[in-house]
């Protein structure tokens, strides 16, 4: 019995892929380049690029930075779950 498979049809790679796509969509909806968005978070622009291109999994530390950032916190739920307000449809930022 594989309880992980039975509990959820989603896997970590699938979740990360969806999150990285939403991360890029959020950045683009804010009209920010990778370097400017990365600077806003305090991470190297190459790290952000690696997240967006799926070369590296988005770490918990980066997610925490987003959750605590005054311009991004309102998008955290959407970013991590895909539920809620899509910033591209709202004309982010909020």
Regions found by a protein language model. Name each.
Residues 3-13, 77-94:
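Short, charged recognition helix plus adjacent turn
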Residues 24, 35, 64:
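Residues within the helices of the helix-turn-helix
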Residues 50, 54, 65:
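Alpha-helical DNA-recognition elements
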Residues 17, 28-29, 57:
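Short amphipathic helical patch at the helix-1/turn junction of helix-turn-helix
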Residues 44, 55, 70, 83:
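The DNA-recognition helices of helix-turn-helix-type DNA-binding domains
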Residues 61-78:
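DNA major-groove recognition helix of helix-turn-helix/homeodomain DNA-binding modules
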Residues 29-50:
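Short alpha-helical DNA-recognition segment
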């Amino acid at each position: 019995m594989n309880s992980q498979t039975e509990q959820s049809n989603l896997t970590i790679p699938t979740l990360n892929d969806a999150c990285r796509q939403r991360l890029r969509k959020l950045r683009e909806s804010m009209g920010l380049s990778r370097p400017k968005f990365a600077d806003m978070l305090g991470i190297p622009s190459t790290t952000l690029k690696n997240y967006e291109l799926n070369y590296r999994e988005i770490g918990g530390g980066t997610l925490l930075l987003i959750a605590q950032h005054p311009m991004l916190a309102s998008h955290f739920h959407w970013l991590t779950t895909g539920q809620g307000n899509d910033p591209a449809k709202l004309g982010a930022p909020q």
